[in-house]
């Protein structure tokens, strides 16, 4: 079967009150359009056609790697007109599935069922299948009109509906599937004689009835699947639905969430056994948490891997890090891209790392900046230590070998190497390589000025 998917993404999204095209607004860390494309990909289609219009170049440049065929709708003349733009690129015998880029939570299982529905009960497969739903509040959506036999014979858009029609709870989701040959016959016949002066895709229902093409409907069990996004309130509502579903899936697999309503996933989260996640944590990109990991409140993890038994304390930010087993991080720590910790390491409060590689058992417990640095095993970094890695033009590396003890308030001016088991005295500025097994410090005499008087404030007149 040749399957062609059309995604409608040309709308302006006026009610978003934004310079950003609606389909680029993010839900769970990804643009709305990306959600729909990723769902479409799971159906293994022969092609995905994205109809773009308003802000089209911005959409294409923002999502250059989407595996889609871009189709331009120069004038936004309605959904039927939008689908028509893609038809020259689609074979007559293909099945066409029409989706909307602002309906991001449609499930692949539902779409598979709809495609199957479009192939039933007719030898030549010439069936029009519609995805419908029963909603308590159908305001703004097209209503399904059925005859006395329960057969669909029309869809009436909200702006064209009278009060009797508006009371109908069954709505059309905007998702349909049929043969391309049907659409190629029906779409050129569309009229814009309606309240919005647009060419509605829903008018193809009347042509299907005239041609005696069977119309089948599939009712989704989950109303969120067909909820569209037209304003920021609806975006927030679907965000919470997505997050609640993600939280439930994690808890079903054994993850403990302190509060599922205060959890945010903006990518992929893979957890081992007995993982605990406290409130207000944000996971972005791909995050892997090993067995027994604990994440404290108000933490942000982006593209991070934690080994077994790690604990991240409150208010810590980790990005682009790989952490081995039994490490302790935070509170108030910042681990930037390129940080790697071997097992049993500790990064304490107000420590920032960047491109820092720690070997086993190394600790930096307080108030330090460690950038572009290699640290050996069992190194102790005192409070206030800074690797001075930038000369104004280039970055330079610091190497700290096994067993080094660095006293508090030390500056290591890179490039510099500290030999194994060396000790650096507190308050030192190290500009040259330090020999192993020795005490190195930079000393300035302590001086007392006797009889010195602290300046006193003058009284104002």
UniProtKB/Swiss-Prot annotation:
GO terms for cellular component: cytoplasm; membrane. The active site is at 366 (proton acceptor). Residues 233-253 are annotated as: Linker. One of its GO terms (biological process) is cell wall organization. Mg(2+) binds at residues 102, 230. It holds the Pfam family Hexapep. Pathway: Nucleotide-sugar biosynthesis; UDP-N-acetyl-alpha-D-glucosamine biosynthesis; N-acetyl-alpha-D-glucosamine 1-phosphate from alpha-D-glucosamine 6-phosphate (route II): step 2/2; Nucleotide-sugar biosynthesis; UDP-N-acetyl-alpha-D-glucosamine biosynthesis; UDP-N-acetyl-alpha-D-glucosamine from N-acetyl-alpha-D-glucosamine 1-phosphate: step 1/1; Bacterial outer membrane biogenesis; LPS lipid A biosynthesis. It is found in: Cytoplasm. UDP-N-acetyl-alpha-D-glucosamine binds at residues 8-11, 22, 73, 78-79, 142, 157, 230, 336, 354, 369, 380. It catalyses: alpha-D-glucosamine 1-phosphate + acetyl-CoA = N-acetyl-alpha-D-glucosamine 1-phosphate + CoA + H(+); N-acetyl-alpha-D-glucosamine 1-phosphate + UTP + H(+) = UDP-N-acetyl-alpha-D-glucosamine + diphosphate. Acetyl-CoA binds at residues 383, 389-390, 408, 426. The keyword Electron transport does not apply. The keyword Magnesium applies. In the N-terminal section; belongs to the N-acetylglucosamine-1-phosphate uridyltransferase family. This is Bifunctional protein GlmU.
């Amino acid at each position: 079967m040749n399957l062609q998917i059309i995604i409608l993404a040309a709308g302006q999204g006026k009610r978003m009150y934004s310079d950003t095209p609606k389909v680029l607004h993010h839900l769970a860390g990804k643009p709305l359009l990306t959600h729909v494309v990723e769902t479409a990909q799971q159906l293994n289609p022969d092609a995905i056609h994205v109809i773009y219009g308003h802000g089209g170049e911005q959409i294409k440049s923002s999502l250059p790697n989407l595996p889609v065929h871009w189709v331009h709708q120069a004038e936004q003349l309605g959904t039927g007109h939008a689908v028509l733009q893609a038809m020259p690129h689609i074979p007559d015998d293909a099945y066409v599935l029409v989706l909307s880029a602002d309906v991001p939570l449609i499930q692949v299982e539902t779409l598979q069922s709809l495609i199957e529905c479009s192939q039933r009960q007719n030898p030549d497969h010439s069936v029009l299948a519609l995805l419908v739903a029963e909603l308590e509040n159908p305001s703004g959506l097209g209503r399904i009109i059925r005859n006395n036999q329960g057969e669909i014979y029309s869809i009436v858009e909200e702006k064209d509906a009278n009060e009797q029609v508006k009371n109908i709870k069954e709505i059309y989701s905007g998702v349909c599937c049929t043969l391309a040959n049907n659409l190629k016959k029906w779409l050129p016949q569309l009229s814009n004689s309606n309240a919005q002066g647009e060419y509605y895709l829903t008018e193809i229902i009347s042509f299907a009835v005239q041609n005696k093409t069977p119309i089948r409907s599939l009712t989704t069990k989950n109303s969120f699947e067909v909820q569209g996004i037209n304003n920021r309130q609806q975006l927030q509502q679907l965000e919470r639905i997505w997050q609640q579903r993600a939280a439930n899936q994690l808890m079903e697999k054994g993850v403990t969430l302190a509060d599922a309503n205060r959890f945010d996933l903006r990518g992929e989260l893979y957890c081992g056994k007995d993982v605990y996640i406290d409130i207000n944590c944000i996971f972005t990109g791909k995050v892997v948490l090993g067995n027994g990991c604990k994440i404290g409140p108000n933490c942000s993890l982006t593209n991070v891997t934690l080994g077994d038994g790690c604990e991240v304390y409150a208010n810590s930010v980790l990005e682009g890090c790989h952490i081995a087993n039994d490490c302790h991080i935070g509170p108030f720590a910042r681990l930037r891209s390129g940080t790697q910790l071997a097992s049993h390491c500790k990064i304490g409060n107000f420590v920032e790392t960047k491109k820092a590689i720690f070997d086993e058992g190394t600790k930096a417990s307080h108030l330090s900046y460690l950038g572009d640095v290699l640290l050996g095993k069992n190194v102790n970094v005192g409070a206030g230590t800074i690797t001075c890695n930038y000369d104004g033009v280039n970055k330079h590396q610091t190497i700290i070998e096994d067993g080094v003890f660095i006293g508090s308030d030390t500056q290591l001016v890179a490039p510099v190497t500290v030999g194994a088991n060396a000790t650096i005295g507190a308050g030192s500025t190290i500009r040259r390589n330090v020999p192993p097994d020795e005490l190195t410090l930079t000393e300035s005499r302590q001086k007392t000025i006797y009889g010195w008087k602290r300046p006193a404030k003058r009284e104002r007149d």
